[in-house]
Amino acid sequence: MLNADLKQQLKQLLELMEGNVEFVASLGSDEKSKELKELLTEISDMSPRLSLSEKSLKRTPSFSVNRPGEETGVTFAGIPLGHEFNSLVLAILQVSGRAPKEKQSIIDQIKNLEGSFHFETFISLTCQKCPDVVQALNLMSVINPNITHSMIDGAVFREESENIMAVPAVFLNGEEFGNGRMTIQDILSKLGSTADASEFENKEPYDVLIVGGGPASGSAAIYTARKGLRTGIVADRIGGQVNDTAGIENFITVKETTGSEFSSNLAAHIDQYDIDAMTGIRATDIEKTDEAIKVTLENGAVLESKTVIIATGAGWRKLNIPGEEQLINKGVAFCPHCDGPLFENKDVAVIGGGNSGVEAAIDLAGIVNHVTLFEFASELKADNVLQDRLRSLSNVDIKTNAKTTEVVGEDHVTGIRYEDMSTGEEHLLNLDGIFVQIGLLPNTSWLKDAVELNERGEIVIDCNNNTNVPGIFAAGDVTDQKNKQIIISMGAGANAALNAFDYIIRN
């Protein structure tokens, strides 16, 4: 089931195993069970440290990744290929005794959790944000014997996932726990375990502190580090919103990559320099004093720096119409690559006629029964090549001059109301899912009145990426820069870094 290149890479990774690992599989006579057995046999044959046995488990087909004679609580229900293959490889290494890369403080938090925690995560193999959650919960299961975790492929266990309309969907002890991308710190926080602020107490002031972890942040950090400046990053995750991007084909010199690969490469590049990257933590306030610029973190710690570059990016913009908020993850979705497979053979709408919306409609048309694309303006704004492709599809309708007014449904989406602005008539369209693709909302709510914002909530900057506060710079999608592109954000990050360097020299 694995191609030659992947087998070669896997064989090298399996050499990092530090102990024996046993696959315990629950298999039937169905096709998926046969595929799973083929995969596990193929992997087992690649290392003398791996073995395969069979046993009846809660779900079939599924398998646990155990140490000989010891259950670890790590289970995969389905066939973990696609984006989840890395989750399987990582689980094998960690169960074998390979030390995780998490900070010791995080490991201690996991060890100190009291109680029994049985997690189940519904995923799709095309979901790019699912592996983060799966890998976090698998690691927690390996570290703490009171924690178990099962990854469940919704495409294989359709009855169980019938009412799952957004992935990853995490359940704890049978109750809904959370949806969407979560870091291991997010999970610990939801369990009531707070991060220790003591590790930040003795940090020396920075020359440049960058808030955010996306392309602008990474570019800025590398540029300032190369200038010999003491550089820090405070971010929820390296890569930012790019982690949720499927294909990237317009980053010059790289013909094609994915958001996950891009983010991984960005993190590796940052690691090559003396950059203090503090991930899994968010900033909650910023203040300029006579002595320094102070950034307060969500754990109460305060970091000081001569300059700060704000590069917190942007998140999905919502419709802000009745019914939307309460039906998010219950039919209202923002990621067609993640959640599209959950709407197979169903009717959906895409809101937004720009490149993102049209690309989403094209992708979904190959999965769902029917797509209706809504655009507020009189014509689509997407590139012509995308519009031509969209109009060639037989299961897509396009509605322009359409103002969406209400998401309809109680426990899940059943329809959408919209106004035809050319006639004033209101209509109800029955459907199962709505994918919102109307642009981005800057992550600036934490700034309060610290710097000047425009009417859209974006940070106002000049050509040197200065804000209205000397020493505080901003770059990327969080700013009022018109075009929001990865390559433009990276250029903006570099520009902000060079001007921060110049500011330090002159002050």
Swiss-Prot record:
Transmembrane segments: none annotated. Keywords: Disulfide bond, FAD, Flavoprotein, NAD, NADP, Oxidoreductase, Redox-active center. The keyword Disulfide bond applies. Its EC number is 1.8.1.-. Its cofactor is FAD. Binds 1 FAD per subunit. NAD(+) binds at residues 347-361. It is an enzyme of class 1 (oxidoreductase). GO terms for molecular function: flavin adenine dinucleotide binding; NAD binding; NADH-dependent peroxiredoxin activity; oxidoreductase activity, acting on a sulfur group of donors, NAD(P) as acceptor. The keyword Disulfide bond applies. Coiled coil: none annotated. FAD binds at residues 207-222, 467-477. Pfam families: Pyr_redox_2, Thioredoxin_3. Belongs to the class-II pyridine nucleotide-disulfide oxidoreductase family. Homodimer. The active site is a redox-active disulfide bond. This is Alkyl hydroperoxide reductase subunit F. It comes from Staphylococcus aureus (strain MSSA476).
